[in-house]
Amino acid sequence: MKLTCVLIIAVLCLTVCQLITADYLRDKQKYRSVRLRDGMLNFKGSRQCADLGEECYTRFCCPGLRCKDLQVPTCLLA
């Protein structure tokens, strides 16, 4: 009987802790540093190749694109 009461009280305490923590963290950002890092990796200036329609006089075009010299060298479909 005592063991059952102790287990019930322990489960209730853990549940209350979970609810308090969830309420406190509701407006907080989760894994903010990971999102910032991913944003920096996908930033337009950090990519190694130039995408469709981008200038290609300082970078190579991405795979499947070719640098065409119009007025300004631009990556176009091959």
Curated annotation (Swiss-Prot):
- Where the protein is mainly located, per its record? secreted
Q: Cystine bridges: which residues?
A: 49-62, 56-67, 61-75
Pyrrolidone carboxylic acid PTM sites in chain numbering: 48
> Which residues get removed as pro-piece?
23-47
Task: Show the stretches that span the lipid bilayer.
Answer: none
Keywords attached to this Swiss-Prot or TrEMBL record, sorted alphabetically, are: Disulfide bond, Knottin, Neurotoxin, Pyrrolidone carboxylic acid, Secreted, Signal, Toxin
The family annotation for this protein states: Belongs to the conotoxin O1 superfamily.
Which protein, by its recorded name, is this?
Answer: Conotoxin ArMKLT2-0313
